[in-house]
Amino acid sequence: MELILLEKVANLGNLGDKVKVKAGYGRNFLLPFGKATVANAANLAAFEERRAELEKAAADKKSSAESRAAQLAELEVTITATAGDEGKLFGSIGTHDIADALTASGVEVAKAEVRLPNGTIRQVGEYDVAVHLHSDVEATVRVVVVAA
């Protein structure tokens, strides 16, 4: 299935690229989420007319993500949780908890943007957490977990 990308897609291509993908990936992900359109003559012409508009929208998204990353870089979030004597938490701190704490401190962050590659936080301490704001923009936030 040949598609024209309407925005940058990780591990696939950039805006305007004509790519060949498996039918399921195109039908179930790229087309329904508006990330691509079918590559035919009519859609190619329509895309070329809208190219400047789409590039401006992509640049706006990236600049917005960069400004949020600058705000996050100087931010340190403290999360209080109940813990045992040795610092082991009763429960865990996940992406949802971190996103809520960041939003409460003034920077809007969705839970899908928070990356915890080693799984949830289960110990009291300081952690550097990656926040993936855009395909080209990633920020690191210091999260301090303290016992209640």
UniProtKB/Swiss-Prot annotation:
Q: Does the keyword Ion transport apply?
A: no
This protein's GO cellular component annotations are: ribonucleoprotein complex; ribosome
Q: Which GO terms describe its molecular function?
A: rRNA binding; structural constituent of ribosome
Keywords per UniProt: Ribonucleoprotein, Ribosomal protein, RNA-binding, rRNA-binding
Record bears the keyword Ribosomal protein = yes
GO terms for biological process, alphabetical: translation
Pfam assignment, any one: Ribosomal_L9_C
* Known function: Binds to the 23S rRNA.
Question: Which HAMAP family does UniProt cross-reference here?
Answer: Ribosomal_bL9
- What's the family? Belongs to the bacterial ribosomal protein bL9 family.
What's this protein's name?
Large ribosomal subunit protein bL9
Q: Which organism is it from?
A: Pseudomonas putida (strain GB-1)
Q: Which gene encodes it?
A: rplI
